[in-house]
Amino acid sequence: MQVIKRDGEIAEFNPDKIYQAILKAAQTVYVLTDDLRQNLAQVTKKVVLDLEEAKVERATISMIQSMVEHRLLGAGYITIAEHYISYRL
């Protein structure tokens, strides 16, 4: 799968970038424990599954970010989702 970046450049999809962005948002609010890291890794995996189910060849950054927000909120990480949203703006 490929990603269409904000500047229009096409890049290979890298799930670790999603995970790192979520961690950055989380560490503004919480101390990153192993349990929290594992839970956020599961959120990342669910986003990857959502993307695979969407069957798009080239996902946009905004599509991926919306999926991340949805999964964070669904997992009860409301504060992390708020910081993730502000981080991406």
Residue ranges, per PLM feature:
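Long, C-terminal-biased catalytic regions of enzyme "large/alpha" subunits
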Residues: 1-89
